[in-house]
Amino acid sequence: MEEIKCLLCRYLKERQEKFISDWKKKVIIRERDPYKEEIIKNGEHLLSAFIMYLKEEISLQEIEITSKKIARERIDAKVNIAEFIHNTNVAKIEIMNILTLLNPDLQQYQALVKKINQFFDHLIYYTVHSYYEQKA
């Protein structure tokens, strides 16, 4: 799995601008959202964090600070947290599509899908949890 994981990290790093550009075309960002620029910055930061997570340079707990920040921005913007979930899933789907392009064998694919799901599930869970905790 290490080889395919390195390939995925290198692919995402080398094509980060294109990845973000493609992601921006599919995300939901309201015109009235005071954090619309910050949404893009958060996406860039989370892509870097995802790469670091795959390289085992950070743990899942280290993205919880970002989760709290995003939750606060969504509350302040008075938007539904579902938009964040949608935007996060757009990124996850893009990464899964890239993974299939790299043509891993079944065992590598399953192991990487597990890592991808762990990262994005943790991110969504802690952001939504923090959103409702802060909103209360």
UniProtKB/Swiss-Prot annotation:
UniProt-listed InterPro entries: Histidine_kinase_N
Pfam families registered for this protein in UniProt? HisK_N
Q: Which Gene3D superfamilies match?
A: Histidine kinase N-terminal domain
Q: Which UniProt keywords apply?
A: Plasmid
Does the keyword field hold DNA-binding? no
Official protein name in the record: Uncharacterized protein pXO2-61/BXB0075/GBAA_pXO2_0075
- Look up and give the organism this protein is from: Bacillus anthracis
